[in-house]
């Protein structure tokens, strides 16, 4: 994904326990591999290890990168510096995630495979402002259009508008 003159790239593939995520300068070419024990170079602005998920994609919103791992571990990074703002288990644990998060205004939405939507504030600390249980499995990422949120579960499509 691209934001504010940077490209954000995650490599949370199966078998790579490090799961790095990095910000790269557009126009980088050739081998931009980081040397061991380094977190930046001419093309890589910053790199954080052990934060990228296997299935959910990351998002950048309100100057922060939100990365949720399949096991529910959420890492929030400063989008410019890559510094970790916080790392926590969404909902306190026990949830798994395939859906990518979405964001609007001062809220970020995470939908678990059990159909539980966690609504978080975009502040510098984990603040769960709402939790909605839909009662059935969901593997789809929510969508936002205008003032509506769309959530698909195994058998239903919900539109939540305000």
Language model: regions and residue ranges:
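Noncatalytic, solvent-exposed loop/strand surfaces
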Residues: 1-162
């Amino acid at each position: 994904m691209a934001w504010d003159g940077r490209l954000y790239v995650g490599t949370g593939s199966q078998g790579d326990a490090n799961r790095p995520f990095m910000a790269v300068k557009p126009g980088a070419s050739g081998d931009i591999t980081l040397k061991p024990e380094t977190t930046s170079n001419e093309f890589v602005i910053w790199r954080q290890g052990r934060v990228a998920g296997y299935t959910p994609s990351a998002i950048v919103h309100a100057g922060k990168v939100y990365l949720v791992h399949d096991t529910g571990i959420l890492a929030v990074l400063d989008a410019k510096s890559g510094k970790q703002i916080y790392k926590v288990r969404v909902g306190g644990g026990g949830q798994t995630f395939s859906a990518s998060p979405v964001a609007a205004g001062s809220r970020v939405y995470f939908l678990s495979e059990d159909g539980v939507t966690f609504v978080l504030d975009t502040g510098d600390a984990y603040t769960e402002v709402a939790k909605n249980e839909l009662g059935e499995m969901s593997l789809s990422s929510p969508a936002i259009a205008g003032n509506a949120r769309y959530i698909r579960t195994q058998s239903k499509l919900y539109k939540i508008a305000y």
